[in-house]
Design a protein with these regions (language model features):
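Aromatic-rich, lipid-facing transmembrane alpha helices and their immediate juxtamembrane interface loops
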Residues: 1-171
Length: 171
């Protein structure tokens, strides 16, 4: 089920990024990190980090803080991986107040905390039901296609250093 959580939250993150860019009038830029699948893995990995925490840690106001810190740690790690190993940056907070090396910033750390609280309370129960209904054969097939997509995407990023090359729609 964790694999489906990753995929679903990565896809929802992609949709959120597209919506955020549209609402804020942000410069049109690519939001996905794979050639085929419209996924933002930082969202999927961030939610996995939150979901593996003990339930007692993720409830109430302290839980919002814990979840925000967990998701922010993932955001930092994902940014570091892309930068260190592939030479690409999908986001840069260096001009945002309270940033750390342009990888994370206070504003989005607070948003992570609130977003994870909303997801845990209202969205995750539906995601959990959906993941439980998926037959193993579909999971294996999706995993093979995803692994091929990830391999090709990582090679393209490493070769070009240009995340825009991943986008057929250029957006």
């Amino acid at each position: 089920m964790l694999l489906w959580y990753f995929w679903i939250y990565s896809f929802l993150g992609y949709l959120l990024e597209k919506g955020f860019a549209k609402v804020t009038g942000a410069k049109l830029q690519g939001r996905k990190c794979f050639l085929l699948f419209p996924l933002c893995p930082v969202y999927g990995l961030g939610m996995l980090a939150v979901l593996v925490l003990p339930e007692a840690l993720i409830r109430g106001v302290p839980g919002i803080i814990v979840c925000g810190v967990a998701a922010t740690a993932v955001e930092y790690g994902v940014h570091w991986f892309y930068d260190a190993f592939l030479g690409v940056r999908f986001w840069d907070y260096s001009r945002v107040f309270g940033n750390l090396r342009g990888r994370i910033c206070l504003q989005f750390s607070l948003i992570w905390g609130g977003l994870t609280a909303v997801v845990i309370r209202w969205i995750h129960p539906a995601v959990e039901r959906l993941a439980e209904r998926t037959v193993p054969e579909v999971t294996y097939l999706c995993l093979m296609v995803f692994a091929l997509d990830a391999f090709c995407s990582l090679r393209l990023l490493k070769a070009t250093g240009d995340p825009e090359r991943l986008r057929a729609d250029r957006g």
